[in-house]
């Protein structure tokens, strides 16, 4: 069975999407990159459904930072917020509910947990799919950065990060080159981070 067919059977959806993109262009190169990152990908994305939890926590962190800093770039705090400071106390992970309650306490907005999960950014029928995709990309990119792997290297040949997620909206302008050169610099097309966070929090 070819690598691409094997890849389609895997459960680690977030790691798989980028690899399938690369595999269509160069299957051998994609296989090499995939297995170089396999241990990290499995540890972060597969173990005890951790991929969904980390996406949720990163999303809440992004919303909260938007309230605190307005248009300030959110990416700087995400790696440690997702993995260390915000969800680990004496090696114990906070639950998503605890994060949501803390967000409500600090901002006055209550986020619907039913709408925050690993699949949310893929559901195009959702009213704010564009905004959620923005924060999903924050989460994904920060996780890969923690593994010392830049997105441009993991997703070989990709030029538009949003394109990897079947998302064609012109409101999302995240480019791999921008991630490489400026660390998750984003253009919100007239909407600042606080406005996006408020819209998401109203769900």
Predicted regions and their residues:
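Amphipathic alpha-helical segments that form the core helices of the histone-fold
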Residues: 77-87, 154-163
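Intrinsic disorder/low-complexity detector
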Residues: 4-63, 86, 90-140, 171-203
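A structural feature that tracks compact, well-ordered secondary-structure segments
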Residues: 64, 77-78, 141-142, 149-157
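Non-catalytic, largely sequence-independent nucleic-acid-binding elements associated
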Residues: 153-163, 194-203
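Protein-protein interaction interfaces in oligomeric scaffolds
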Residues: 66, 72-73
């Amino acid at each position: 069975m070819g690598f691409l067919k094997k890849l389609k059977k895997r459960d680690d959806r977030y790691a798989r999407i980028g690899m399938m993109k690369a595999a269509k262009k160069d299957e051998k190169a994609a296989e090499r990159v995939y297995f170089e990152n396999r241990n990290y990908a499995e540890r972060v994305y597969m173990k005890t459904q951790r991929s969904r939890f980390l996406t949720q926590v990163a999303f809440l962190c992004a919303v909260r930072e938007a309230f605190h800093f307005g248009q300030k770039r959110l990416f700087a705090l995400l790696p440690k917020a997702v993995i260390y400071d915000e969800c680990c106390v004496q090696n114990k992970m906070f639950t998503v509910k605890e994060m949501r309650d803390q967000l409500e306490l600090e901002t006055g907005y209550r986020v619907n947990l039913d709408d925050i999960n690993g699949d949310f950014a893929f559901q195009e029928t959702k009213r704010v799919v564009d905004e959620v995709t923005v924060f999903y990309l924050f989460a994904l990119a920060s996780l890969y950065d923690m593994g010392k792997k830049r997105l441009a290297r993991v997703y070989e040949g990709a030029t538009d990060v949003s394109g990897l997620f079947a998302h064609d909206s012109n409101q999302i302008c995240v480019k791999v080159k921008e991630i490489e050169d400026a660390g998750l610099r984003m253009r919100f097309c007239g909407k600042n981070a606080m406005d996006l966070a408020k819209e998401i929090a109203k769900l």
